Amino acid sequence: IKKSVEKVGYKNIILDSVQSTIFLKLKGMKIGFGALGEGYATDKCRDMMLAKGIKAGIINGSGDMSTWGKQPNGKAWNIGITNPFHPEKLLAVVPLKQDAVTTSGSYEKFVVLDGKRYSHIINPATGYPATGLCSVTVLGPNAETANGLSASLKKKKKTAGLLLLKKYPDYSCIMITD
């Protein structure tokens, strides 16, 4: 695990905007888009629909959602937030009109070893599963940013996560502790 963590982080990535290239300094480094890809794709789909004149809709990209306009009945889109301790139940329902909602959680993808549950979300600083928060839902104007924030906040402790979120005043969150 220690060797894997050595290959994590932006400091070993060289971006060249002139050549439009990315260079990974260390052999074995990889780039994963899991924390941003769904949100980015969701936003792009919404933008394409808006460009085609579609006045209202909801795009669901693997649970990351982007909305615009209103439902045919004139009401906001109602998005259910799953209760991580009872996944068959909703914790809350949030109305969205021109917003996005994303969730990073450990309640759907995990492994149980020796009776202990481990998240699929890894803390890049330690190389071990993230602990402390079992679910983080972020709401805001952009699914890509919300997706990045929910993934980042899930890896932090609650207080540190709330401090980070203060830098993004257009976004709010629902944090559920383990």
Predicted regions and their residues:
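Mature catalytic core of soluble alpha/beta enzymes
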Residues: I1-D178
